[in-house]
């Protein structure tokens, strides 16, 4: 399982590396957006998920790097997926976490952090991490 930790770090790094300036795309419904991303990943479509995430955060150049990290899920069977956290902080910031069990792989969490702007919600951060023993990965959620 340590491999996924390296991949999760790389996925985070891919999204914070400076790229050509682009504006984040406002998201009308963070709940629907998060659900869609997890669904795309579970359908073994890492390219589509990477493109959507990278374009939404305003870093289209990060798509190829992110796809490489998401490919770990390409041959995995998503046995169970459910939203486990949806925390809204006074309509200004919001965190959504999905939990998935992947047969033969283990437990994976997908985290989406959204922030409100004058134009609407933006995806400020996306990451994923595995955890076997605890309910949530350490330092992964704001609880």
Regions inferred by a protein language model and the residue ranges of each:
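Bacterial N-terminal signal peptides that target proteins for export
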Residues: 1-9
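Short helix/turn-capping signatures at newly exposed starts of structured segments
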Residues: 3, 21-28
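Short, linear, compositionally biased motifs with a strong N-terminal bias
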Residues: 11-14
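N-terminal signal peptide c-region/cleavage motif recognized by signal peptidases
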Residues: 16-19
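Short solvent-exposed beta->alpha transition segments
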Residues: 24-25, 31-35, 47-95, 106
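Conserved short acidic donor-positioning loop in nucleotide-sugar-dependent glycosyltransferases
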Residues: 44
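Exposed beta-sheet edge and beta->alpha loop/turn motif
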Residues: 88-143
């Amino acid at each position: 399982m340590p491999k996924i930790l390296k991949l999760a770090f790389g996925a985070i790094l891919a999204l914070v590396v400076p790229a050509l300036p682009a504006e984040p795309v406002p998201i009308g419904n963070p709940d629907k957006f998060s659900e869609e991303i997890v669904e795309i990943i579970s359908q073994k479509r890492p390219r589509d998920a990477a493109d959507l995430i990278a374009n939404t955060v305003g870093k289209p150049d990060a798509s190829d790097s992110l796809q490489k990290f998401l490919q770990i899920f390409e041959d995995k069977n998503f046995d169970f997926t459910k939203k486990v956290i949806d925390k809204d902080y006074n309509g200004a910031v919001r965190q959504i976490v999905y939990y998935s069990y992947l047969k033969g792989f283990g437990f994976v969490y997908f985290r989406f952090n959204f922030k409100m702007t004058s134009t609407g919600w933006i995806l400020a951060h996306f990451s994923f991490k595995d955890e076997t023993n605890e309910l949530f990965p350490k330092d992964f959620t704001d609880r």
